[in-house]
Amino acid sequence: MKGQMTKSKRISLIATFAAIAAILDSIPGIPQFESGVWYSWIFLVVPLFGFILGPVDGFLSILIGVLVGHSIYFRGIHEFLFAIGAPVGAMIAGMLFRQKRSIPIIFFTVLLASYFLTPISWQLPLWGMWDVYLAFIVLLIVTITTFNKSRLLICTFVGLEADILFRIFLLIPLQTYHLFYGFTPEAMKIIWVAGAFVTPIQVGISILFTMIIYPPVQKVVQRTRDNGILSSNTDST
């Protein structure tokens, strides 16, 4: 009975958070953000869900949310593929938040290497991905130091940049910029420059949102989990 109750609570939490994600992903962002990575408001909760639900459940809740959100606010069939970046970001954020650093490091290393081994990347402004480089450097630093005091900030930043890097991996190494959208290298240069300014603003907004929202939301979720455990113990006696 206890195991069933715990599973029921888990499914309920995933469904609840997925509904929130779907709402945020179905609301268009402000026009000034269109040159950034995210076209909706899903970026606000990507790392937050990874922290609260954990890497796996955070991934699932965001994945369900963006699939529903993209169906409501349709951005093109190809965007469903790029939407996977959001749950990946939640997973990486959740792992790092729980001090699991090996997979995030491998993720950043492999995807960055793939990017620089792709010929078109040599034609794009090197500084256009400055925020991704910074996230990788921060990730390497926290592997040899403790970061409890700034854990929330660091994990939020790295999780969002993991989302961005995954989308870049789809766009450049997998060459969907040409296969899906027919972009030329010249067009990609413009996109890279614009994204270098807009996307970090979105990241900053998400960091501020997470720092404010995480503590109260975590308390509510923890209380829900505790109540579920208490209820299951009561039922089993």
For each feature predicted by the language model, list its residue ranges.
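Loop-helix junctions at membrane interfaces
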Residues: M1-T237
